From Swiss-Prot:
Domain HTH tetR-type: 3-63
Official protein name in the record: Tetracycline repressor protein class A from transposon 1721
Binding site for tetracycline: H64, N82
Gene Ontology biological process: negative regulation of DNA-templated transcription; response to antibiotic
UniProt-listed NCBIfam families: PRK13756.1 (NF010319)
Protein's organism: Escherichia coli
Gene3D superfamilies in alphabetical order: Homeodomain-like (1.10.10.60), Tetracycline Repressor, domain 2 (1.10.357.10)
Lineage: Bacteria, Pseudomonadati, Pseudomonadota, Gammaproteobacteria, Enterobacterales
SUPFAM superfamilies (UniProt xref): Homeodomain-like, Tetracyclin repressor-like, C-terminal domain
Length: 216
């Protein structure tokens, strides 16, 4: 009998995830999919949380194509490109944001984070401002995808017409405009607000502490 490999388990788990979602992804179902007994999975993943950590890492490795700075990036283009790429990686699989939330980063993610921080610090950010910028954009991206994927799931579960409280004309117009724009536009606008805010903060820091490398 061929020995079960971790990558085989991860691939099967990702396929199963797309079919049943994170709540339906159990070690029992995964073992059945692989044609093995449950204890065989524990050689590689001691529990479901460890498996989810591995799935999150695989999602990023497979789909996060702008995780580290490129040669032509400045700090703005990197943060924007990184966020867009991260979002696409989470959207690539059902419940991708839920899988990622709360995961423990492995060695590849730590190396990526180090490269990101070094790039931002070389662009003039302090270490504290650099990590806060990265975490703010990460939290925003995960939250945005959580809402987007939850909305897709809930639409099918609720079915029919959901009774709503009366809406004022202003609130109705705002909701209609938001719905018409769609999640891509909402994400881009929120991301622009964050990056613009970081640029303004850099101006404040420059006025207080003097220019830093990378300031325009």
């Amino acid at each position: 009998m061929t020995k079960l490999q971790p990558n085989t388990v991860i691939r099967a788990a990702l396929d199963l995830l797309n079919e049943v979602g994170v709540d339906g992804l159990t070690t029992r179902k995964l073992a059945e999919r692989l044609g093995v007994q449950q204890p065989a999975l524990y050689w590689h993943f001691r529990n479901k949380r460890a498996l989810l950590d591995a799935l999150a890492e695989a999602m990023l490795a497979e789909n996060h194509t702008h995780s580290v700075p490129r040669a032509d990036d400045d700090w703005r283009s990197f943060l924007i490109g990184n966020a867009r790429s991260f979002r696409q990686a989470l959207l690539a699989y059902r419940d991708g944001a839920r899988i990622h939330a709360g995961t423990r980063p492995g060695a590849p993610q730590m190396e990526t984070a180090d490269a990101q921080l070094r790039f931002l610090c070389e662009a003039g950010f302090s270490a504290g401002d650099a990590v806060n910028a990265l975490m703010t954009i990460s939290y925003f991206t995960v939250g945005a995808v959580l809402e987007e994927q939850a909305g897709d799931s809930d639409a099918g579960e609720r079915g029919g017409t959901v009774e709503q409280a009366p809406l004022s004309p202003l609130l109705r117009a705002a909701i209609d405009a938001f719905d018409e724009a769609g999640p891509d536009a909402a994400f881009e606008q929120g991301l622009a607000v964050i990056v613009d805010g970081l640029a303004k903060r850099r101006l404040v820091v420059r006025n207080v502490e003097g220019p830093r490398k990378g300031d325009d």
